[in-house]
C-alpha cells in the first residue's frame, strides 16, 4: 500500500507537482509567484501523503484490529 501511495503521491517528481499546482494556481487567477509555488510544492505532497496513509491505517484498523498487534510486534 505504501509503495502504491508513493507512486501516486510521490515527492520524487517536483516537475509534476509544479505543473499541477501551477495550473491550479493559474485557474484561480493568481499571479505566478515562484516562491509561493516552490513552497506549495515542498509542503503539499507531504501533507497529502500523510493524510492518505493515516486514512489507510485507520481503515485497516477498523477492518482488522489484529493488524495493530502485528504492527506493534514488528516495531519491537
Curated annotation (Swiss-Prot):
Keywords carried by this UniProt record: Antiport, Chloroplast, Hydrogen ion transport, Ion transport, Membrane, Plastid, Plastid inner membrane, Potassium, Potassium transport, Transmembrane, Transmembrane helix, Transport
Membrane-spanning parts: 35-52
Compartments in which it is found: Plastid, Chloroplast inner membrane
InterPro entries, per database record: CemA
One example of a Gene Ontology biological process annotation: proton transmembrane transport
Bilayer disposition of the protein: Multi-pass membrane protein
Entry's family note: Belongs to the CemA family.
Protein name: Potassium/proton antiporter CemA
Species classification: Eukaryota, Viridiplantae, Streptophyta, Embryophyta, Tracheophyta
Amino acid at each position: 500500500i505504501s509503495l502504491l501511495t508513493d507512486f501516486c503521491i510521490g515527492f520524487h517528481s517536483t516537475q509534476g507537482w509544479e505543473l499541477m499546482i501551477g495550473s491550479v494556481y493559474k485557474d484561480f487567477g493568481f499571479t505566478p509567484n515562484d516562491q509561493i509555488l516552490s513552497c506549495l510544492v515542498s509542503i503539499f505532497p507531504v501533507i497529502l501523503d500523510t493524510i492518505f496513509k493515516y486514512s489507510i491505517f485507520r481503515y485497516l484498523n477498523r477492518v482488522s484490529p489484529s493488524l495493530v498487534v502485528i504492527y506493534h510486534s514488528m516495531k519491537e
